[in-house]
């Protein structure tokens, strides 16, 4: 999809303000998640009522970060230098995220009211002419009296009804494209430095519907379909960007 995939994020928005870290609940929660490679980590969330300790786990193999916050449960996977081999494809990530999110919600007897998946990546194999052509296509920018723009942002959002499991819900579908200079390094050694196109793809259900309705089956259904939606979204975006 991208030259470098930098982040996957899967989120289940849930009323979980009352769920705080308790040592006595750590082992039962780990048993419910059923993954021996999860390691408990420290997490303190700043809330309107003060600091609260929350559950957090890191997956030893993939580096997935599971955070059970007061208003959302997140699974995040970030690119590990030098080669990002931990990222895998989005379908495999969503499959693992579905188990972590649904296991967490089931353990605490909760349902989510909103679901979201975000993919961030970089296009690095571009020359200066590619940047100029892309800026012309996306921006229709005014002539400011200098050279072509070296930094810019472009963003679009639309609503699409999508079916998954027993649900047919309206989703927000967003694409964010930006030019920026990026430096990537590992152990103090530079891996990449230069201009890139950053792309963020985001598909999430209607934030205005606060009804707790997504149980574990709903989460698995959503995350089982979203990789296909993301592939289609990227194909449409890539075709628009480069005319391919």
Locations of regions flagged by a protein language model:
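Macromolecular interaction modules
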Residues: 1-15, 170-175, 201, 206
């Amino acid at each position: 999809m991208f030259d470098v995939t930098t982040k996957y994020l899967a989120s289940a928005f849930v009323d979980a303000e009352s769920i705080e870290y308790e040592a006595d609940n750590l082992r039962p929660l780990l048993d419910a998640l059923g993954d021996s490679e999860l390691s408990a980590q420290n997490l303190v969330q700043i809330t309107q009522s003060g600091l609260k300790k929350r559950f957090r786990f890191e997956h030893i193999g993939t580096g997935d970060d599971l955070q059970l916050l007061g208003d959302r449960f997140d699974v995040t996977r970030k690119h590990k230098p030098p080669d990002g081999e931990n990222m895998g494809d989005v379908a495999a990530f969503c499959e693992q995220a579905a188990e972590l999110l649904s296991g967490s919600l089931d353990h605490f007897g909760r349902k989510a009211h909103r679901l979201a998946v975000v993919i961030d990546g970089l296009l690095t194999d571009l020359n200066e002419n590619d940047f100029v052509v892309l800026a012309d296509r996306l921006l229709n920018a005014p002539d400011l009296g200098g050279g072509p723009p070296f930094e810019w942002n472009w963003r679009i959002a639309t609503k699409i009804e999508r079916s998954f499991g027993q649900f047919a819900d309206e989703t927000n579908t967003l694409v964010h494209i930006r030019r920026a200079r990026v430096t990537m390094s590992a152990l103090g050694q530079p891996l990449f430095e230069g201009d890139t196109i950053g792309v963020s793809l985001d598909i999430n259900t209607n934030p205005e519907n606060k009804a707790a309705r997504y149980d574990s089956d709903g989460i698995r259904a959503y995350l089982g379909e979203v990789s296909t939606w993301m592939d289609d979204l990227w194909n449409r975006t890539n075709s628009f960007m480069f005319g391919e």
